[in-house]
Amino acid sequence: MDHLNRAQAPFPAFIWERIDAAAVAAASALLTGRRFLEVEGPFGLGLTAIELGADDYCRVPDANEAGAVISRAISVPMLRKSCRLSARRLAAHLDNDTPLNLAEVENAAEAVARREEEFIYLGQADFGLDGLLNASGHREVKGAAWSNLDAALDAVLAAITRLDEGGFHGPYALALPPAHYNNLFRHYEHTDLLQIEHLKSLCTHGVYKAAIDMPVVVDKHAGAVVLGQDLHVGYAGSDGIHYQLFVCESMVLRLDEQEAVCVVTD
């Protein structure tokens, strides 16, 4: 099933390779969840839901009653953003070897990546999807102002200790709001050691800048990003001026251990 409709596009395969490369590079620069969580799949466009946990009886049956075995399932969202490619500029590239501007494709890929990050960190509560920051059962520690070097270190150590005491021994990843992340590029007094390098020695699964409001420490085994369709670009048609394209993917966060996540609150 060619849901990307590429066979209908009036341009050669190497242009698709250029488009794909631009989209993947733009999205990859923003994606953090995939870098510290396991990634499973892609399993294909038809993956619309995944099951969580084990099958079990929904209630204990009476002696003369049939039992009902059931599991819980969550939906797999499809993310999509439209974009355009100028027919004239593509012709100029093919005929005259002028540079091919793929900024709209890159912008669309970035929009899809930002939405993926939102699903990973915040979920979609009205559709029963948990995120790392708001899943029921996650751990929390109190933090102080990250403008203070000691406060930042103390907060991360407290979060790691909470996870370790709960049986989650790492490796750990640390995801930070932009301001918190940028504050780590400071030297400890009388040393050449940047704080970010110090924290990377504690959070060996990586320290990442993400579009979130609170720091979070995540054990590697907290869950996985499950892919239906990985990021691709498809063809929707032409109006004679632009080729209508779209960037799409389908994914969901599967949280196996909510208690393997520790959020640092203000």
Where are these regions (language model features)?
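Short, catalytically relevant binding-site loops at active-site mouths
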Residues: 126-130, 138, 179-183, 214, ...
